[in-house]
């Protein structure tokens, strides 16, 4: 891949992002023919990964001028920045917004790979990963595994080989590189989770989706380093509506009237689904009285041809809604009802509703539920499945972000748990003991509460608290994660399922 400096100039001018060029000869608004015809062969925002042919982006709150100085010493000649730096570079390209500039230049450098793919984007406070996986399984059937996926849990650019994601939605440079790789791998469809931070920080600036899916909205990610208010969080989430050719909306989502109004105002066609028929609902589902894993899709007009019976492996009515949203999105990009039925029936999600049996016959659930709504839905489902026993819940909360979850977890534990085991979950730079204390401070119900900071020991303790086969133990928050984020380092972690399984095997 290459791009000329003239092409870079044109991209920036088109978006009104260019301020000026700085070279040893001075400050200018234009480029000489010699300089303008020069091409760069790589893009980077890592100052340790540059050559003379790299276009380097000076971005981030933690960026320091010394990083650029060191990069220039290593041979870097061209940089993009919001401010000029006193460095002996051949060219500084000064822009009004570095994140927007990186997005549009990454698109151009990788030859607009989004235009060569069918793009499906999911947003919502909960359910994004599960709904994305349902869509992946459906489209794998429809496209013979020519579907790429970027998700919180795992990602694949060839439809088969998975790798761990660093961010829910990657930086724009990485995103377009991944899209270009997917195109080179023969992929025709591209599914991704779109976070509120992706819109707030312009990672998906100017990116439009063939289909967007808005699952739900509840307060989350509200903290000084994420979203200062719920309004800011919700506004960023709503940007998916205005950047989709068609939007799929959940009728039961909080603030649904505003979501629908946003789509109407932006003239974005909307398809509405829900758990109950209603005048505004295009597709609803009814749960089978004979089989809790079966549901019936109903529709007054059935414009997409989706009405019929579906079976899935994942329990919980909320997963039926996730499956229905995936089916609607999949049909909009070329799948058939039969392919939807086949894909939904086959879907499994790492770290979602995984279960095993404790030594005394009690069921152990491992799930990624990591905010109020997802944990409440999970615990409600488990309560319904195990009405006669105690519900033992192991949970922790992340450090340095989503601080409001600590209060939320105390609240949901008070509402639904019988026993709580508080432990470590990606504490980052914070003291996990203090995080657990904050959660416990918001538990208002009289109940046993244990704090065991070593997560492996906490899992063993939670399982040992079960006394009958009627009990249920929920290990929440980590899902299939195989690391703990501690002080900027991803420390290896065996995983909740593996640790629970090892404890059970040792006791048997």
Swiss-Prot record:
Keyword Membrane: no
Alphabetized UniProt keyword annotations: ATP-binding, Cell cycle, Cell division, Cell shape, Cell wall biogenesis/degradation, Cytoplasm, Ligase, Nucleotide-binding, Peptidoglycan synthesis
EC number(s) per entry: 6.3.2.7
Catalysis: reaction(s): UDP-N-acetyl-alpha-D-muramoyl-L-alanyl-D-glutamate + L-lysine + ATP = UDP-N-acetyl-alpha-D-muramoyl-L-alanyl-gamma-D-glutamyl-L-lysine + ADP + phosphate + H(+)
Keyword ATP-binding attributed: yes
GO annotation terms (biological process): cell division; cell wall organization; peptidoglycan biosynthetic process; regulation of cell shape
Major location category of this protein: cytoplasm
Pathway(s) served: Cell wall biogenesis; peptidoglycan biosynthesis
InterPro entries, per database record: Mur-like_cat_sf, Mur_ligase_C, Mur_ligase_C_dom_sf, Mur_ligase_cen, MurE/MurF_N, UDP-N-AcMur-Glu-dNH2Pim_ligase
PTM annotation (N6-carboxylysine): residues: 237
Function: Catalyzes the addition of L-lysine to the nucleotide precursor UDP-N-acetylmuramoyl-L-alanyl-D-glutamate (UMAG) in the biosynthesis of bacterial cell-wall peptidoglycan.
Protein name from the UniProt record: UDP-N-acetylmuramoyl-L-alanyl-D-glutamate--L-lysine ligase
Organism: Enterococcus faecalis (strain ATCC 700802 / V583)
């Amino acid at each position: 891949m290459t791009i000329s400096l003239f092409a870079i100039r044109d991209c920036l001018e088109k978006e009104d992002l260019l301020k000026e060029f700085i070279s040893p000869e001075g400050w200018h608004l234009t480029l000489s023919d010699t300089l303008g015809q020069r091409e760069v062969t790589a893009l980077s925002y890592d100052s340790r990964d540059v050559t003379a042919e790299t276009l380097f982006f000076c971005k981030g709150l933690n960026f320091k001028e010394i990083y650029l100085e060191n990069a220039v010493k290593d041979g870097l000649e061209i940089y993009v920045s919001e401010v000029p730096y006193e460095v002996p570079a051949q060219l500084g390209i000064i822009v009004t917004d570095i994140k927007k500039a990186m997005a549009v230049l990454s698109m151009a450098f990788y030859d607009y790979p989004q235009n060569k793919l069918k793009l499906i984007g999911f947003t919502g406070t909960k359910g994004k990963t599960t709904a994305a996986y349902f869509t992946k399984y459906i489209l794998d059937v429809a496209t013979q595994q020519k579907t790429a996926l970027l998700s919180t849990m795992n990602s694949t650019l060839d439809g088969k080989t998975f790798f761990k994601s660093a961010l829910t939605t990657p930086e724009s440079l990485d995103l377009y590189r991944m899209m270009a790789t997917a195109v080179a791998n023969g992929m025709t469809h591209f599914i991704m989770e779109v976070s509120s931070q992706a819109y707030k920080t312009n990672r998906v600036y100017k990116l439009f989706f063939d289909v967007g899916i808005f699952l739900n909205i509840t307060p989350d990610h509200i903290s000084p380093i994420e979203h200062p208010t719920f309004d800011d969080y919700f506004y960023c989430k709503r940007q998916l509506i205005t950047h989709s050719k068609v939007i799929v909306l959940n009728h039961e989502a909080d603030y649904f009237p505003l979501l629908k109004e946003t789509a109407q105002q932006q003239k974005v066609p909307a398809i509405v689904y829900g758990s109950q028929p209603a005048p505004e609902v295009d597709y609803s589902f009814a749960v089978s009285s004979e089989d809790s894993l079966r549901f019936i899709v109903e529709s007054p007009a059935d414009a997409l041809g989706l009405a019929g019976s579906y079976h899935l492996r994942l329990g919980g009515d909320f997963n039926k809604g996730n499956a229905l949203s995936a089916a609607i999105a999949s049909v909009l990009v070329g799948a058939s009802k039969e392919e939807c039925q086949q894909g939904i029936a086959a879907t499994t999600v790492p770290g979602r509703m995984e279960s095993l049996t404790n030594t005394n016959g009690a069921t152990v659930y491992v799930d990624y539920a990591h905010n109020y709504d997802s944990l409440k839905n999970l615990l409600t489902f488990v309560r319904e499945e195990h009405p006669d026993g105690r519900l033992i819940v192991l949970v922790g909360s992340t450090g340095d972000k989503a601080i409001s979850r600590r209060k939320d977890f105390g609240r949901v534990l008070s509402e639904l748990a019988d026993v709580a085991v508080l432990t470590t979950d990606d504490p980052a730079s914070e003291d996990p003991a203090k995080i657990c204390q904050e959660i416990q401070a918001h538990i208002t119900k009289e109940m046993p509460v244990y704090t065991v900071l070593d997560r492996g020991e906490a899992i063993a303790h939670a399982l040992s608290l079960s006394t009958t086969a009627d009990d249920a133990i929920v290990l929440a928050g980590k899902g299939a994660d195989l690391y703990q984020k501690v002080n900027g380092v991803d420390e290896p972690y065996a995983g909740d399922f593996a640790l629970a399984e090892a404890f059970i095997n040792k006791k048997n």
